[in-house]
Amino acid sequence: YKQHRDPKSLDAALAEAAPNGVDGNFENVGGEILNAVLRRMNAFGRVALCGMISGYDGVPIPLSNPSLMLTQRLRVEGFIVSEHMDVWPEALKELGTLVATGRLKYRETIAPRIEDAPQAFLGLLKGKNFGKQLVKLL
């Protein structure tokens, strides 16, 4: 998404990546990313909302075409991690195994000093990091 900052470019990239449309989307970003994915969703697709970082700065996140949720008969559901703490140990074990075996890969951006934390946080809100944003404390 970082190299596709405008809707046309993002639409083209998604069309290339998913020429047959999208059946499921795990959404953490919102904003233009969500708008672009909704335009590619297949009928009866599912959207799991787990974050909307594009709106964490307090600016409302507009949907460019909310009627797509109706016309495509999409199922959109929000998930809050803290509501599923009963399965946390099981999920942690399974995800840990996937990371350890290389089947699940992660990326992170590390700010080298605690003094860099404010700038790292602002960069997180502006999409300047890649993956999880961390700050080295020691």
Task: Show which residues each predicted segment covers.
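Short conserved AdoMet
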Residues: P19, N42, N129
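CheY-like receiver
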Residues: A13-A17, L98, A120-G123
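Adenosine-nucleotide cofactor-binding segment
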Residues: Y1-A36, S82
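Short, amphipathic alpha-helical "lid/cap" segments that border enzyme active or binding sites
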Residues: D11, L92, I114-P118
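Short acidic-hydrophobic, aromatic-tinged amphipathic segments that line or gate anion-handling sites
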Residues: Y1-D6, T109-D116
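Glycine-rich phosphate-binding loop and adjacent beta-alpha segment
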Residues: E32-L104, L137-L138
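C-terminal capping/lid region of NAD(P)-dependent oxidoreductase domains
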Residues: R103-I110, P118-L138
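Non-transmembrane alpha-helical segments in soluble domains
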Residues: F26, L38, G96, P118-L122
